[in-house]
Regions:
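Electrostatic cytochrome c docking/interface patches
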Residues: 29-53, 65-69
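Periplasmic/extracellular electron-transfer cofactor-ligation site
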Residues: 49, 53-115, 144-153
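Axial heme c-ligation environment in periplasmic c-type cytochrome domains
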Residues: 104, 110-130, 145-170
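Hydrophobic helical h-region of N-terminal Sec-dependent signal peptides
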Residues: 10-16
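Bacterial N-terminal signal peptides that target proteins for export
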Residues: 1-9
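An amphipathic alpha-helix signature
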Residues: 134-138, 142, 169, 173
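C-terminal motif of bacterial Sec signal peptides marking the signal peptidase cleavage site
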Residues: 18-21
């Protein structure tokens, strides 16, 4: 009787093992957690477009054109900054500097107590940031340095680099 019980247990264990190996695994495989690269966006370009929108980069770096509804981005000059052909603000700087701030109609040049600021060209062209390294870009944003060069002058108002520096390196890359 004892031998029958051992044989029965062995056969049962063998059957269970065989059935468990032959049965179709219907359990859903958990997909490996992907590192959230690009903030959940499908590409680095889409992530960059999102950051430009949220950061308001084109508010100052894309010249505006006037319409019946007010200023709108001139998409033909997207992120080109205050371009070479645009006139400098024609104002009495001493009066402006004592009273506050003046902004041009294109919203790409500002006059204030610090002097005159012109928004930079952020296009991928060599006249913009096309020749910058990743390090230059991070230095400009994190340290507020002109052209991303540590030994250069600070970025001028109204560039909000003090707020932008709070973005992580991964967000900025």
């Amino acid at each position: 009787m004892k031998n029958k019980f051992i044989v029965l247990c062995f056969l049962s264990a063998t059957c269970i093992f065989i059935f468990s190996q032959c049965s179709e695994n219907t359990a859903t495989k958990k997909e490996p957690e992907m590192k959230q690269k690009f903030g959940g966006f499908e590409s680095q370009v889409k992530w960059g477009e999102h950051l430009v929108l949220l950061g308001g980069c084109s508010d100052c770096h894309t010249p505006k054109k006037m319409t019946p509804k007010g200023p709108v981005n001139d998409e033909t000059l997207f992120m080109s900054g205050h371009t070479e052909g645009m006139p400098a603000p024609d104002i009495d700087r001493k009066e402006v500097e004592s009273k506050g701030l003046v902004v041009t109609q294109t919203l790409t040049a500002w006059v204030g107590p610090w002097g005159i600021s012109y928004s930079g060209n952020l296009t991928p062209d060599e006249t913009g940031i096309g020749t910058w390294t990743e390090s230059n870009f991070l230095t400009a944003i994190k340290e507020g340095k002109y052209k991303g060069i540590s030994a250069s002058r600070p970025l001028m108002p109204p560039m909000p680099w003090e707020q932008m520096k709070k973005l992580s390196d991964d967000e900025l890359k």
